[in-house]
């Protein structure tokens, strides 16, 4: 069966055909690091981790780029507010602190490190190059009020609105800079001229004066830098469809780039039946979530619904996940104990059942895939009851394969070693970062550097295993 994904732009399921045979380029909008990460950030990271794992299992080499928006209005505003109350933390330090929180939470959930994780501030020249092209093509203009702002001219691009199937006339004005300098209220900022109350460190030189990039141009530039002018999948939360992704598509296409071939969006998170929001005071931080249960249960809970659905987090969510995981772990414990010393030990083929593959190929239907997983656990237990060790071994192999694909295998070294100590969590973060650096080296065929990282980890007692589902590590016994 061919993998099918719901493409937001097409408004329909489409067969997934990579631009290059055997390879997938995927860009995912990462966090804007103006505050601590919350449950919505983790849900999004987990969704694209599941997609990446399935593509990898299917034999595709995935290049995943997930950006970090480390400069924008909110980052600067939050840093300024903290300084007004007597703090001394600079905006870039605040952004880095929250970036580290997001990374640590992602590692705790078993989210594999992106191939590339660029910060917006490291791609300023690439952003300016796209802006210059847009000006030359007549799709952008510098504000005439001396502010240093540069805007995208929405009226110059008739296709504007194609992602969300809206007409420009039906859209409201963008509220991202002084509207008096715009030709049209719906025009959006590509470059924001420096303001008097903003720090020197947040201003970058440009042909239009010192300033900083608008939010939308950041992702267009970073995706192009790491994946090229055309790539396979652009992902992000449902709340980013408009205006962020609509603006990304318009400015990249107007600059002459084909951009993303598939647009994939994950659903949002409700808390106790209500939309999560600051005004309701019901936001659940990553720290709160990971403190409420072991990370494996959090991963199972957030990843058990269909990625496009809105999930509802409530008091019983994590206990339901724990119960499901106990059934899986209980089967592994029982079958391994019974098969020990028999000719069936290790005989089960670690291949997912056809029904599981069909579910995952059907727009990543994880709920149906989990149903297959739990049915296989039940049949495996029934085989043990009947002393059918061959069938039990086969079921074990299938359960192992399915839980590996979903990242919820309780036998995985990560989950066996997920403890409550800060030292263990710090070790996991450090090892994952080194593995990320190793993957980057391999991407550019710098095998000397990649081997050196592996040797350093081995010397520290860390075993590295490269598998079809990704790189796994464990501490040598």
UniProtKB/Swiss-Prot annotation:
Q: What is its EC number?
A: 6.1.1.16
User: Might you name a Gene Ontology BP term for this protein?
Assistant: cysteinyl-tRNA aminoacylation
Quick one: a GO cellular component term? cytosol
| Name this protein carries in UniProt | Cysteine--tRNA ligase
From which source organism is this entry? Leifsonia xyli subsp. xyli (strain CTCB07)
* Subcellular compartments: Cytoplasm
Give cofactor(s), names only: Zn(2+)
Residue ranges of the motif 'KMSKS' region:
275-279
Please give the family membership noted in the entry.
Belongs to the class-I aminoacyl-tRNA synthetase family.
Catalytic reactions on record? tRNA(Cys) + L-cysteine + ATP = L-cysteinyl-tRNA(Cys) + AMP + diphosphate
> What's a Pfam family in this record?
DALR_2
Under the heading InterPro entries, the entry gives: Cys-tRNA-ligase, Cys-tRNA-synt_Ia_DALR, Cys-tRNA/MSH_ligase, CysS_C, Rossmann-like_a/b/a_fold, tRNA-synt_1_cat_dom, tRNAsynth_Ia_anticodon-bd
Could you give the subunit structure recorded for this chain?
Answer: Monomer.
């Amino acid at each position: 069966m061919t993998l099918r994904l719901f493409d937001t732009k097409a408004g329909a399921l489409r067969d997934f055909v990579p631009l290059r045979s055997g390879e997938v380029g995927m860009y995912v909008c990462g966090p804007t690091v103006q505050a601590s990460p919350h449950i919505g950030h983790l849900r999004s990271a987990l969704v694209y981790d599941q997609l990446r794992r399935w593509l990898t299992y299917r034999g595709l080499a995935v290049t995943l780029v997930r950006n970090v928006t480390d400069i924008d209005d909110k980052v600067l505003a939050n840093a300024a507010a903290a300084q007004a109350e007597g703090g001394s933390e600079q905006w870039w330090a605040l952004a880095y602190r929250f970036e580290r929180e997001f990374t640590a939470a992602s590692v705790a959930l078993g989210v594999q490190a992106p191939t590339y994780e660029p910060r917006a501030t490291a791609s300023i020249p690439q952003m300016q190059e796209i802006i210059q092209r847009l000006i030359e093509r007549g799709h952008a203009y510098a504000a005439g009020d001396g502010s240093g702002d540069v805007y995208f001219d929405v009226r110059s691009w008739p296709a504007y609105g194609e992602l969300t199937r809206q007409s420009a006339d039906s859209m409201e004005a963008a509220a991202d800079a002084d509207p008096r300098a715009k030709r049209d209220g719906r025009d959006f900022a590509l470059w924001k001229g420096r303001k008097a109350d903003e720090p020197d460190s947040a201003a970058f030189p440009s042909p239009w004066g010192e300033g900083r990039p608008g939010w939308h141009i950041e992702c267009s530039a970073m995706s192009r830098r790491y994946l090229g002018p055309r790539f396979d999948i652009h992902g992000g939360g449902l709340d980013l469809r408009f205006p962020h992704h609509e603006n990304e598509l318009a400015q990249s296409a107007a600059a002459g780039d084909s951009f993303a071939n598939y647009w994939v969006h994950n659903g949002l998170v409700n808390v106790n039946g209500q939309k999560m929001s600051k005004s309701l005071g019901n936001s659940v931080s990553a720290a709160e979530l990971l403190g409420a249960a072991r990370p494996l249960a959090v991963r199972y809970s957030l990843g058990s619904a269909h990625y496009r659905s809105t999930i509802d987090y409530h008091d019983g969510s994590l206990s339901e996940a724990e119960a499901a995981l106990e059934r899986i772990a209980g089967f592994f414990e029982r079958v391994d104990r019974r098969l020990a010393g028999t000719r069936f030990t290790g005989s089960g083929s670690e291949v997912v059942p056809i029904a599981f593959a069909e579910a995952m190929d059907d727009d990543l239907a994880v709920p149906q895939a989990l149903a297959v997983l739990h049915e296989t656990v039940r049949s495996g237990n029934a085989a043990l009851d009947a002393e059918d060790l061959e069938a039990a071994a086969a079921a074990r192999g299938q359960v192992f394969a399915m839980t590996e694909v979903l990242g919820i295998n309780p036998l995985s070294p990560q989950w066996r070693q997920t403890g409550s100590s800060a030292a263990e969590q710090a070790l996991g973060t450090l090892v994952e970062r080194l593995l990320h650096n190793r993957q980057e080296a391999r991407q550019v065929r710098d095998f000397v550097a990649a081997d050196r990282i592996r040797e350093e980890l081995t010397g520290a007692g860390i075993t590295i295993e490269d598998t079809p589902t990704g790189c796994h590590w464990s501490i040598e016994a």
